[in-house]
Amino acid sequence: MTTSLVLAVPSKGRLQENAEAFFARAGLTLAKPRGVRDYRGTIAELDNVEIAYLSASEIASQLARGTVHLGVTGEDLIRESIVDADKRVALITSLGFGNANVVVAVPQSWIDVRTMADLDDVATGFRAQHNRRMRVATKYINLTRAFFASHGVVDYRIVESAGATEGAPAVGTAEMIVDITTTGATLTANGLRVLDDGVILRSQANLVASREADWSNGARETARVILDHIAARARASKYREVRTRFPGCDAALLKEAHDRFGVVSPFGGPTSSGMVTLHCPPDRLYALASFLRLHGADTVSIASLDYVFDRDNPLFEKLEVFLRT
C-alpha cells in the first residue's frame, strides 16, 4: 500500500487564504471534495496527497512528531516549539507571506535603554533595587531564553502570556515583553518600542519538511512533483520572456546582453535566422529592448511566464539532502 503524502495547511484566516493562493500560483489547486467545513482535502491535480487543515501551532507540533510530511507554518512557531529544530525539520522554502518579527520591546519611558547591553544593566539594577528579577511577558519562552542568554542577560524571569502580551507592562504584570509584530503599531499604541538590536527573529510562513515522517518512495515522488511545481513558479516569477529576430543577433551580442542586463538564454541561440528567446529580470526589460533595437531589432516582444521547469529541482534536492543526513 502506497503511503500518501500529508501536507498540513493552516485551517483558517489569512494564512489559509495565502497558502491556498500560493499553491494555486504553482498550479496546485487545494480542494475540499466533502465540503468547506471538512478538515481534510486534496490537491486536484495530484493523487496520493492528503491535505490536513490544522492551526499553525498544531502544524509545527505535527511536523515534529512526523504525522505530516510537509507543512505550512511560521518559522517563529518552528523555532519556539521544536527542540533542535534544524535536526528534526527542514525549512524548504519561504512563501512570502505571514511576515512578522519576534522582538524585545520596552516601555518608551526607558529613554536610556536602547540595546540589549543597556537592558542587562537595567536588569541588574532592577534586581538590586527591588530585590526581585525584572519580569518579561511572552509566549516565546524558548526564543526569549536563547536570545537573552546570547546577550548575557540573566537577571529576569519569564511571565508566560496567553493573551494580549503588549498590555502586560501597562497593567503591571511585567516590566517588558517579547512578542511578535508586523508593523509595530500595536506596540507603539501600548507605549512600547523595540530595542535597536532587539529583533530576535524575522519570521514568515515556510514550507517545512519533517524528518520523522514516513518517507516512502511514493511520498518522495509526490513531494518531488509538488516541489517541482513550486520551483518552476518561483523561477518564472524572476523573469519575463523576451523574443526577437534580426540579422545582427549573434553570440557576442547575447554575451553583452547577459553581462549588462542579467539575461539568460534558456534555449541557446541565436538561430541561423537570428531568432532568440531571452529571459530577463522585470526591472531591466526596457533597457534590454532598447539595446536590442539599437543593434537592429525591429520588433521585441515581451511576455509573462507562468512556469519555467528546469532539469534541476533545487527544492527537492534540499529535501533529499536533509533526509539523507
UniProtKB/Swiss-Prot annotation:
Its cofactor is Mg(2+). Its EC number is 2.4.2.17. Feedback inhibited by histidine. Keywords: Amino-acid biosynthesis, ATP-binding, Cytoplasm, Glycosyltransferase, Histidine biosynthesis, Magnesium, Metal-binding, Nucleotide-binding, Transferase. GO terms for cellular component: cytoplasm. Belongs to the ATP phosphoribosyltransferase family. Long subfamily. This is ATP phosphoribosyltransferase. It comes from Nitrobacter winogradskyi (strain ATCC 25391 / DSM 10237 / CIP 104748 / NCIMB 11846 / Nb-255).
